[in-house]
Amino acid sequence: MAVPTTAVEGVRSRGAPGEVIHLNVGGKRFSTSRQTLTWIPDSFFSSLLSGRISTLKDETGAIFIDRDPTVFAPILNFLRTKELDPRGVHGSSLLHEAQFYGLTPLVRRLQVREELDRSSCGNVLFNGYLPPPVFPVKRRNRHSLVGPQQIGGRPAPVRRSNTMPPNLGNAGLLGRMLDDRAPPSPSGQPEEPGMVRLVCGHHNWIAVAYTHFLVCYRLKEASGWQLAFSSPRLDWPIERLALTARVLGGAPGEHDKMVAAATGSEILLWALQAQGGGSEIGVFHLGVPVEALFFVGNQLIATSHTGRIGVWNAVTKHWQVQEVQPITSYDAAGSFLLLGCSNGSIYYVDVQKFPLRMKDNDLLVSELYRDPAEDGVTALSVYLTPKTSDSGNWIEIAYGTSSGVVRVIVQHPETVGSGPQLFQTFSVHRSPVTKIMLSEKHLISVCADNNHVRTWSVTRFRGMISTQPGSTPLASFKILALESADGLGGCSAGNDIGPYGERDDQQVFIQKVVPNASQLFVRLSSTGQRVCSVRSVDGSATTAFTVLECEGSRRLGSRPRRYLLTGQANGSLAMWDLTTAMDGLGQTPAGGLTEEELMDQLEQCELSPLTSSRASFPSPSPRTSLTSLHSASSNTSLCGHRGSPSPPQAGARSRGAGSFVDRFKELARGAPELRGPPTPAPRPSTSLGNPLILPKNTLNETSF
């Protein structure tokens, strides 16, 4: 049983530097000397043994410390030898414990170790950074704003570059607003009015939705991403976002670039101009909460689980609302839309060729297929095979049900009138299917059991799905993604795991494990293999993400590129090159120094305190405030590591400078104010006998 000891008793128990101290760390006993524990001033151990901190002792008299003994072992080894041997301990855990014990030299060394994998400029996949835009002050009219806006009689700064800004995440008025946080919400967490809620892309355009406004960026080949449109401030938070940037074969005068936002039952639609700016087309009402908002061609579609569907036709400029069965899923291909309903029916809507019935002015909605068990269709995916004849495409539809069943139905071009035929059935899920994807090579299904994924290989003959040998099981894995209970991790619609990508190419899942995570994992949708992981360059949490298939350059040999877009809690937007990541899949990266090699190099010097904002660890005493390796003269050899020690000067002795060997000699002469760690084993000299001249410049973390 641990017995408390008062601070006064701790002071009285001070002993000689060679006194043996017994520690009980988390139930494991350690024995070391007082000198080993106290050579770093103002640390946890020096305060403990000097009586400034009350102690607990177990039944044997050992000082009890309620910390992890596994992590304490390499820390004690560092205090003994001044060498770091992690012994399989995770770097972040070791850094956390070093900060707890107040071991400033070890903390600095571990921070440099972490810089191996972290950079404010990202990694090789980092492709661009867009700072937060200017926040619209008022909604004076229903016309949109673009470019610099007048705020207080002066133009607000708008950064129009896809490079890293000098002040990460604090450009523009929105960035400054984040410094003055709103009062805490009822859940106790601060509100994030400027975080990215939704992000979507189409061809060379990006739409980013914040709480009360949205912006659009356009990619220009020579100048990069440019701000093209900024909406006025809205009175309600944006919950859904849709963008279309190019329509092939559209009639003259049609809107070919549009962006729409919705919340509740209200939908706002804007037309975008290629040269920048935009105008409001109109405000539409669905009458019930909008749960899905998307474009099929240049037709805007809004659906609700209640069974109501709204279509805005770009040709007739007509908004039509119609009731069907309660909608539980949807998918689109070409110019037609499929709706999965709770009664097991799959409805077919051609939104371009036959938008309205001639008699009753209703949408042309027809039942395409009904599930044999009449289970609700909770996920839909349609695949159009390449056109092999004048009669049309072979239509393949995969869908999942509320009972966990996955079915594949097909329709021949010659048998359009008879409807699709059931092709395959898989009963591998015990929870409702939430996502499904039928691509050229794979069938992928996801169920509600923590995003459990099952995949199959699809065999095709002349582009059409084949029964010999049919679909074969490929992989089973999970994409764990926890959702926030208070909504502070971002809008749920902006954190869709996917799969993303064209159906004739490799598709990927995007995994954000916890709501406030700053790191995303990109995994192949077919096997679950990790493609890469990206971490926000400014350290802010990622609140929304999507994958953009961007058009290639007009230059010879260029090809389309695939980008991962991540919206951050501070309002910024980062872009990552997934094409490069996919090309390097399976290759072993050739790096520079390993962590062990870096630690070996850092043992040859003392690190000065960080002057940047990334570390704020004050130096408690002059001995730990060394900004460089001090020496008595410019030709002094490096003591304590290699060579022979030179006699210390009196001035250096009074300041506590010199190598720890010099300080150890002073300690042996009886100087109580000079303490150092035990002398480590001498290192073999790599020189040819010439002394190493100490560097004149300050060594700090940025030197490595």
UniProtKB/Swiss-Prot annotation:
Which GO biological-process labels does this protein carry?
positive regulation of epidermal growth factor receptor signaling pathway; protein homooligomerization
Q: Which SUPFAM superfamilies match?
A: POZ domain, WD40 repeat-like
Family per record: Belongs to the KCTD3 family.
Tell me where the WD repeats sit in this chain: 233-280, 283-322, 324-359, 428-466, 548-586
What name goes with this protein?
SH3KBP1-binding protein 1
| Residues with the Phosphothreonine modification | 163
According to the UniProt entry, where does the motif PXXXPR sit in this chain?
A: 618-623, 678-683
GO molecular function (one): identical protein binding
Main localization, broad class = other
Recorded hits in Pfam families, A to Z, give: BTB_2
Q: Which residues carry this modification: N-acetylalanine?
A: 2
**Which spans are transmembrane here?**
none
Record's compositionally biased regions (Low complexity): 611-631
What subcellular compartments does it reside in?
Lysosome
For region Disordered, the annotated ranges are 146-165, 609-704
Per the record's keyword annotation, is Repressor included, yes or no? no
Quaternary data? Monomer. Interacts with CUL3; interaction is direct and forms a 5:5 heterodecamer. Interacts (via PXXXPR motifs) with SH3KBP1 (via SH3 domains). Directly interacts with cathepsin B/CTSB.
Its gene name is Shkbp1
Domain BTB, by residue range, is 19-88
Q: Which residues are annotated with the PTM Phosphoserine?
A: 644, 646
Which key words tag this protein in UniProt?
Acetylation, Lysosome, Phosphoprotein, Repeat, WD repeat
From the record, what ranges are coiled-coil?
none
Gene Ontology cellular component list? lysosome
Quote the function comment for this protein. Answer: Inhibits CBL-SH3KBP1 complex mediated down-regulation of EGFR signaling by sequestration of SH3KBP1. Binds to SH3KBP1 and prevents its interaction with CBL and inhibits translocation of SH3KBP1 to EGFR containing vesicles upon EGF stimulation.
Species whose genome carries this gene: Rattus norvegicus (Rat)
InterPro entries per record: BTB/POZ_dom, SHKBP1/KCTD3, SHKBP1_KCTD3_BTB_POZ, SKP1/BTB/POZ_sf, T1-type_BTB, WD40/YVTN_repeat-like_dom_sf, WD40_repeat_dom_sf
